[in-house]
From Swiss-Prot:
Subunit relationships: Component of the ClpX-ClpP complex. Forms a hexameric ring that, in the presence of ATP, binds to fourteen ClpP subunits assembled into a disk-like structure with a central cavity, resembling the structure of eukaryotic proteasomes.
Functional description taken from the UniProt entry: ATP-dependent specificity component of the Clp protease. It directs the protease to specific substrates. Can perform chaperone functions in the absence of ClpP.
Binding site for ATP: P131, T132, G133, S134, G135, K136, T137, Y138
Protein name from the UniProt record: ATP-dependent Clp protease ATP-binding subunit ClpX
Cystine residue pairs: none
Any one GO MF annotation of this record: zinc ion binding
Alphabetized UniProt keyword annotations: ATP-binding, Chaperone, Metal-binding, Nucleotide-binding, Zinc
GO cellular component, one term: HslUV protease complex
């Protein structure tokens, strides 16, 4: 048994040698003792080693099919966009992590090709074009969760050129660093999603002598970080000044996904695609409104919309999303893993109450979202308004077993049906 000096009653840790008076706790084993400080040190060592093992597992890159399947579990519709994103993201992280991302002997095979040794693969940032509420942001968030990389969302409308009132573009990078818990190395392999990118389009198609600090000026400021540069970021955000320290982050391996609704872009696409005749006698090929979709977009359309050529050139992957149909919006409510209806059913079950939505109610919720023109984004606020009175009352009652929502309830023409708990128990007993 571990002792100190002449004192038979003074015990010490068998690992660090500290006496029981020098530590808070001494735990006894068969002939040995360990103090609380050594236990804490052991836990840190174990966590560090497990963390390194987890990081090693994360280097195995999922295939485009696996990425697509993951998106399918959470996002309804937009199959073309999901396939395009899966391939683009796979190629990006394959470029970042190298051949070891796929395992096997690929690294050895690559070194055998002398003609490819000095080839540098360029970065492929992504531009997503589509109406509001169609799932652009959610697609990017789901991608980042699957790849387990830091993810930051920025709003392009708040950005201005350096020296003007508003946010510098470097503040976008600060959000990514914060999402990585200030681990710059981890942040350098993250994803930045910039929304409302169409709001920084050039105010005029022709260059102007007047300064456009929130439009073309922001596009110019974004060019370097999109392409890849070592940026200096103020750790607390805000404007730069010479007497502060900066965080240095290399954006060469940061994947940028920029997105916007691009209202009016369909008219630009239509004017290009719908008039193919040349000369006075040539027939004009008129297209109807339904014949033009975002999927027909080309770089020259974005140029005419107001994006500068250099900015478009740094976004080589262009993918489009379309308005969700009525049936797809109903599926958004019920089918994904984190479906809105499932979320509310879980919340109600925490109070011991089942929640049921009739098919007519789901259709009514979607009809209201379509009337507002907000797409899937408006579904939660409609559900919240419908269920708010019930959610206020239920925690105070213990006699309710099930709440049934009909279409009339959603339309404000009736009250929810409350089935007593006893009736619900008997009903479940018969079905069992």
């Amino acid at each position: 048994m571990a002792r100190i000096g002449e004192s038979a009653d003074l015990l010490k840790c068998s690992f660090c040698g500290k006496s029981q008076k020098q530590v808070r706790k001494l735990i006894a084993g068969p002939g040995v003792y360990i103090c609380d400080e050594c236990i804490e040190l052991c836990n840190e060592i174990i966590e560090e080693e497990l963390g390194e093992a987890a990081e090693a597992d994360e280097t195995v890159l999922p295939t485009p099919q696996e990425i697509f399947d993951h998106l399918e579990s959470f996002v309804i519709g937009q199959e073309a966009a999901k396939r395009s994103l899966a391939v683009a993201v796979y190629n990006h992280y394959k470029r970042v992590r190298g051949p070891q991302a796929r395992g096997g002997d690929l690294a050895d095979r690559l070194t055998e090709r002398d003609d490819l040794a000095d080839v540098e693969v360029g970065k492929s940032n992504i531009l997503m074009v589509g109406p509001t509420g169609s799932g652009k942001t959610y697609l990017a968030q789901t991608l980042a969760r699957r790849l387990n990389v830091p993810f930051a969302v920025a709003d392009a409308t708040s950005l201005t050129e350096a020296g003007y009132v508003g946010e510098d573009v470097e503040n976008i990078l600060l959000k990514l660093i914060q999402a990585a818990d200030y681990d710059v190395k981890k942040a350098e392999q993250g994803i930045i999603y910039i929304d409302e990118i169409d709001k920084i389009s050039r105010k005029s198609e022709n260059p102007s002598i007047t300064r456009d600090v929130s439009g073309e000026g922001v596009q110019q400021a974004l060019l370097k970080i999109l392409e890849g540069t070592v940026a200096s970021v103020p750790p607390q955000g805000g404007r730069k000044h010479p007497h502060q320290e900066f965080l240095q982050i290399d954006t060469s391996n940061v994947l940028f996904i920029v997105a916007g609704a691009f209202a009016g872009l369909d008219e630009i696409i239509g004017s290009r695609a719908g008039r193919k005749g040349i000369g006075f006698g040539a027939p004009l090929n008129h297209l109807g409104a339904g014949d033009v979709t975002y999927a027909d977009v080309r770089p020259e359309d974005l140029l005419k919309f107001g994006l500068i050529p250099e900015f478009i050139g740094r976004l080589p992957v262009i993918t489009t999303v379309e308005d969700l149909t009525h049936e797809q919006l109903v599926r958004v409510l019920t089918e994904p893993k984190n479906a809105l209806l499932k979320q509310y059913q879980k919340m109600f079950l925490m109070d011991g109450v089942e929640l049921e939505f009739e098919q007519d109610a789901l259709d009514a919720v979607v009809a209201q979202a379509e009337a507002r023109g907000t797409g899937a984004r408006g579904l939660r606020s409609i559900m919240e308004n419908v269920l708010k009175p019930v959610m206020f009352e239920l925690p105070s009652r213990s006699d309710v077993g099930t709440v049934v929502i009909s279409g009339d309830v959603v339309r404000g023409e009736a009250e929810p049906t409350l089935i007593p708990a006893e009736v619900e128990r008997r009903r479940r007993g018969r079905s069992a």
